[in-house]
C-alpha cells in the first residue's frame, strides 16, 4: 500500500524542495567556474582570446565554427618557450659536437667544429648562420630516427639553461600553456608550427604542451628506409631538407601537413608573419596574436619594435608591429598582459 500524504504535508514538502533548489542555485552563483586564464591580466589581449572562443563556439552565433574546423597553430620558440640567448636546439647541436668529433677525429681541425671544440664562447657566438647550418646538418643526421629521439630526450633531461639553471622544458610560458588548454577544452585542435626541427620538438611536445607528435609541423629533413642487421626495418635521418618551416614555409607546411587554414594563430617574430597573415585572410572571425618580448626583468626585452633592443634571435621589427596594428592582430605585451611568465615563479 502506498504512503498517503495529507495536503498540508504535501505543501511543506513542495516548499522544502523549492528552498533546496534555491539554495543550490545560490551556491552555484557563489562558486563560479574557474578562470581558464589565471596568469593573464585583464586587458585587450585576454579579452580577445575569451571573446574569440566564446563567439566561435556558441551555437547560433553568426561566427560559429564547427569543431572540425577549429584549428589553432602556435609557433614555439619565443611564443611557447624561451628562445634567448640562443635556440635550445642549437645548444643541443653544439653540445653534440664533441661526440661527433670523437667519432670523426678529422673534424677537430675543420671549421666550424674546431671553434666549437675550443670552448671559446665569444668565438662560438660569432659563428655565422652558414656555420650553424653545417653543425646542425652534421649533428642531426646520419643516425636512426629512434636513436635521435633517445639522444635528444637524454639531453633534455640533463641540459640546463644558463640563466635560470632549469631544464629547457621548464622555460615554457604559463599563460600560453593556459591558452592551449583553454582552446582544447573548447574543441580546438592545437598544432605547433615551428621553424625548429620537427623531430626534435616531437620528442617532448606531448609531455610539455599536450600536443601529440602528429600535430607538430616543423623544419623537416629527409629519412631513408632500410633494414638493420637483425632484419628489422628502420629510418635513417639524412642531410636533405624537405621543408623549411619558417616565413612563407609556415603556411606551406600548414597546407601540406594539416590541410586546413587555421582560425587562430600565435607567433612572436618576423618568421611568423606569413602564418599570421594566412590565418587572418580566411573567411569568418579569425584570431592572429603576436607576443612582444618587452620584459627584461622577468624574461628578455628585444624587438627592435617599439624601441626595444635589436635581436638576431626572434626579430620583431617595427614594420611587423605596424602591420599587426593595421590588420587587427592582437599584440601581447609580456610585461603588461602576463601576471606570471613561468609556472615556477612565486
Feature map (PLM): residue ranges:
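Short regulatory "switch" loops immediately downstream of catalytic or recognition motifs
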Residues: 1-2, 55-58, 279
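Bacterial N-terminal signal peptides that target proteins for export
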Residues: 2-14
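Non-catalytic pre-domain segments flanking phosphatase-related domains
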Residues: 13, 20, 27-76, 91, ...
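C-terminal cap/substrate-recognition subdomain and adjoining C-terminal extension
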Residues: 29-40, 44-50, 54, 69, ...
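Short, solvent-exposed loop/turn elements at domain surfaces
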Residues: 58-60, 81-83, 225-226
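Asp-based phosphoryl-transfer active-site loop
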Residues: 70-85, 276
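Short catalytic/ligand-binding loop motif for oxyanion handling, primarily in non-cytosolic enzymes
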Residues: 82, 89-90, 200-201
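A metal-dependent, Asp-based hydrolase signature
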Residues: 86, 91-170, 174
Amino acid at each position: 500500500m502506498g504512503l498517503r500524504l495529507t495536503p498540508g504535508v504535501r505543501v511543506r514538502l513542495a516548499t522544502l524542495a523549492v528552498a533546496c533548489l534555491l539554495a543550490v542555485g545560490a551556491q552555484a552563483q557563489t562558486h563560479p567556474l574557474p578562470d581558464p586564464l589565471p596568469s593573464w591580466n585583464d586587458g585587450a589581449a585576454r579579452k580577445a582570446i575569451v571573446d574569440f572562443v566564446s563567439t566561435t563556439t556558441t551555437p547560433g552565433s553568426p561566427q560559429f565554427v564547427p569543431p572540425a574546423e577549429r584549428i589553432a597553430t602556435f609557433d614555439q620558440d619565443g611564443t611557447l618557450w624561451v628562445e634567448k640567448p640562443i635556440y635550445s636546439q642549437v645548444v643541443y647541436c653544439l653540445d653534440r659536437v664533441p661526440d661527433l668529433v670523437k667519432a670523426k677525429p678529422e673534424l677537430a681541425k675543420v671549421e666550424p667544429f674546431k671553434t666549437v671544440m675550443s670552448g671559446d664562447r665569444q668565438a662560438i657566438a660569432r659563428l655565422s648562420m652558414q656555420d650553424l647550418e653545417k653543425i646542425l646538418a652534421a649533428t642531426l643526421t646520419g643516425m636512426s630516427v629512434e636513436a635521435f629521439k633517445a639522444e635528444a630526450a637524454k639531453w633534455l633531461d640533463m641540459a640546463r639553461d644558463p640563466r635560470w639553471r632549469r631544464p629547457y622544458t621548464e622555460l615554457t610560458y604559463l599563460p600560453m600553456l593556459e591558452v592551449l588548454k583553454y582552446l582544447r577544452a573548447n574543441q580546438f585542435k592545437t598544432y605547433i608550427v615551428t621553424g625548429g626541427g620537427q623531430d626534435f620538438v616531437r620528442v617532448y611536445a606531448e609531455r610539455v604542451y599536450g600536443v601529440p607528435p602528429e600535430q607538430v609541423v616543423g623544419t623537416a629533413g629527409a629519412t631513408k628506409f632500410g633494414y638493420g642487421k637483425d632484419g628489422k626495418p628502420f629510418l635513417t635521418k639524412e642531410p636533405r631538407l624537405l621543408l623549411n618551416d619558417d616565413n612563407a614555409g609556415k603556411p606551406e607546411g600548414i597546407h601540406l601537413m594539416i590541410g586546413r587554414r587555421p582560425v587562430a594563430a600565435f607567433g612572436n617574430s618576423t618568421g611568423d608573419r606569413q602564418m599570421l597573415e594566412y590565418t587572418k585572410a580566411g573567411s569568418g572571425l579569425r584570431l592572429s596574436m603576436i607576443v612582444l618580448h618587452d620584459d627584461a626583468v622577468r624574461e628578455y626585452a628585444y624587438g627592435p619594435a617599439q624601441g626595444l633592443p635589436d635581436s638576431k634571435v626572434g626579430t620583431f621589427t617595427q614594420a611587423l608591429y605596424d602591420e599587426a596594428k593595421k590588420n587587427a592582430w592582437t599584440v601581447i605585451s609580456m610585461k603588461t598582459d602576463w601576471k606570471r611568465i613561468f609556472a615556477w615563479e612565486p
